[in-house]
A protein has these predicted regions:
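Metallo-beta-lactamase
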Residues: 85, 92-94, 152-221, 266-278, ...
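Divalent metal-coordination and catalytic microenvironments
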Residues: 64, 79, 89, 104, ...
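Accessory terminal helices/loops
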Residues: 32-48, 159-166, 172-185, 189-190, ...
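Active-site metal-binding motif and surrounding structural segment of the metallo-beta-lactamase
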Residues: 53, 83-84, 95-143, 203
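Conserved beta-strand hairpin/beta-sheet module of binuclear metal-dependent hydrolase folds
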Residues: 55-108, 231-244
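C-terminal motif of bacterial Sec signal peptides marking the signal peptidase cleavage site
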Residues: 24-27
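Feature captures hydrophobic
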Residues: 399, 405-411, 415-418, 422, ...
């Protein structure tokens, strides 16, 4: 955890890692500070007004396209065909998918022939298992060829940090009265059921044309909010499904939950590709559909805004300015600034500038003072000496909170935490500062992240994992993914000086080896000089690592063959726990 985060995550002792994404629930003791109700500043009132965009409703069109809006963070789309239907984006959970389909089947109860993922995010994929399990005849699962890779990374090596940061950004553990909306939807609902991701069985690289249930479909790779993003084009119906490359708010060119660099220029190019088709209907995966002249006008304004931020960031970068300077100089031109599609209810220009800079030039901004700076603790010590003692920093923190200078209060609290000074009191003041700023923020990502962080800092707060994986989800994930997770979970202090090799033989015939040396775990298929030979089923291996089974019991039952070295195997597994 970061040095300034104090969260207790309760997990059973034998859980080595947890796969579910964003399945977190909070609990607070009676001593926790009560949360104030929403403060309706003018900017927050605009966010409240934006909630009308997400009133639950199925929008139906004469061309046989139906869009479920407001049932979860993402829309789900049904396209009627001949004797069967297609689902585009499967909602954020099996629970939400079932609720949405109860409306869809009233319109047309023909079987679902295919589910198309526009990209890898859980709010578009985690409901797929509902449709997959509706009948014996399984629907085709269609996506870009890299979607499974990105799903495995989020459900694998990055899961712990992405889960926590995502839960903050979407406010998943905020009291109901604190959550206004999440900018592109009313709420994130994935915590209501086990994730229902199904691995795609039809994939493509650049373009795919096919016919399903008499529906002519074109799928086009369209880099934007994700690298695996695609858009769906139905040429006979002049209907465009752009995924997350456009919605009714300024785009998330960077997301504060954390992401790989988003190719902003590629995003513009993708929108231009969509414009070249001259669509008459636009069915985004967030916010309401559009039709008629509004479609092309909105696509044009949206791509112009993205290009403007991109181009002006590059222009000022080339003048030698740093990110903190550039963010003060870029705002949208008046010609497009008032567009309702560019309100900063999801992404912001300031965050976008920083991400564009980093995407082109990396973490070093060019300022020599920041090339190899003092540690935060050393800086805090010198600041303490400069102001006559650490207690004076604390007095300044109290004064900042008293005068509502809350951003300064947050930054001062960083120094005090680095010096481990009055942590309980500092956290209380830090919580007040975060809550104050969050209450007045109209950007839901910023608002929810700050309010969630304020809640975390309160006494007695805990995060608990409330859902685990199930066997169906684990079947979708490759064995390589599980070994990659083990590699990054290795505790280097538990590795002995001499190399140590464990060889796994699985019932599928797969052979994998983990060699511990030099504080790393090398994953290979080398089977010579094994110190430990383990035999077990592929599924059991996944289920043990996901926490569905206690390895001690499985070894004792003989389900895991350790060839007489049970204790040694359990000691080996313990090296991958923090």
């Amino acid at each position: 955890m970061p040095y300034n985060t104090y969260i207790h995550m309760n997990t059973k002792s034998y859980h080595f890692f947890l796969l579910p994404l964003i399945f977190l629930l909070s609990s607070c003791s009676d001593e926790a500070i009560s949360q104030p109700k929403i403060e309706f500043t003018s900017s927050v009132e605009k966010l409240v007004e934006h909630t009308k965009e997400f009133i639950p409703k199925v929008y139906s069109y004469d061309n046989g396209i139906h869009v479920a809006v407001g049932f979860g963070i993402a829309n789900s789309i049904m396209v009627e065909g001949e004797g069967g239907n297609i689902i585009i984006d499967a909602a954020d959970s099996v629970y939400e998918a079932e609720k949405i389909y109860s409306y869809f089947k009233e319109i047309n109860s023909n079987p679902i022939k295919a589910v198309i993922y526009t990209h890898n995010h859980g709010d578009h994929t985690f409901g797929a298992a509902y449709y997959y399990n509706l009948s014996e005849e399984k629907p085709k699962i269609i996506a870009h060829e890299t979607t499974a890779y990105y799903m495995e990374r989020i459900l694998g090596i990055l899961n712990p940090i992405i889960s926590v940061r995502s839960s903050r950004m979407f406010g998943t553990f905020l009291p109901e009265e604190q959550l206004i909306n999440v900018g592109i939807g009313p709420f994130l609902g994935v915590s209501q059921s086990v994730p229902g991701y199904i691995k795609p069985d039809i994939t493509f690289a650049d373009e795919l044309k096919l016919s399903i249930a008499g529906i002519d479909i074109e799928l086009h790779h369209a880099i934007g909010e994700t690298n695996d993003q695609l858009f769906v084009w139905l040429p006979q119906r002049k209907a465009l499904m752009p995924g997350d490359n456009i919605y009714k708010t300024f785009p998330n060119l960077y997301t504060i939950r954390g992401t790989t660099h988003r190719d902003v220029k590629g995003w513009v190019d993708s929108l231009d590709h969509m414009r070249s088709l001259d669509p008459e209907f636009l069915f985004p995966s967030h916010t309401k559909p559009l039709e008629g002249d509004e479609v092309m006008a909105t696509l044009t304004i949206y791509r112009d805004a993205i290009q403007y931020v991109h181009d002006q960031t590059i222009r000022l970068m080339n003048q030698g300015l740093y990110p903190d300077q550039i963010i003060e100089l870029i705002e949208l031109p008046k010609e497009i600034a008032d567009s309702p599609f560019l309100n900063e209810f999801y992404g912001t220009i300031r965050w976008s500038v920083k991400s564009i800079f980093n995407g082109y030039l990396g973490w070093f901004n060019g300022n020599i003072a920041e090339l190899d700076p003092l540690s935060r603790k050393d800086e805090a010590l010198r600041l303490s000496d400069m102001v006559g003692g650490i207690e004076n920093i604390y007095l300044q923190l109290e004064m900042a909170v008293e005068t509502n200078d809350m951003q300064w209060a947050l930054q001062l609290s960083d120094h005090l935490i680095a010096l481990d000074y009055k942590i309980k009191d500092v956290n209380k003041l830090r919580s007040q500062a975060a809550d104050y700023i969050g209450q007045r923020s109209s950007n839901p990502n910023k608002r929810n992240y700050l309010l969630s962080s304020a809640l975390e800092l309160q006494p007695g707060f805990e995060l608990e994992n409330i859902l685990t994986s199930d066997s169906l989800l684990l079947e979708q994930l490759s064995m390589d993914n599980f070994f990659n997770i083990l590699s990054v979970r290795l505790n280097p202090d538990a590795v002995e000086a001499d190399p140590y090799r464990v060889c796994f033989k699985f019932d599928s015939g797969l052979i994998k080896t983990i060699t511990l040396r030099n504080k790393i775990a090398e994953i290979s298929s080398i089977t010579t000089n094994c110190d430990l030979n383990i035999e077990l089923a592929d599924d059991l291996f996944k289920e043990v690592l996901a926490g569905l089974h206690n390895p001690i019991r499985k070894v004792a039952a003989g389900d895991i063959n350790t060839n007489g070295k049970s204790a040694e195997f359990l000691i080996f597994l313990s090296k991958f726990r923090d």
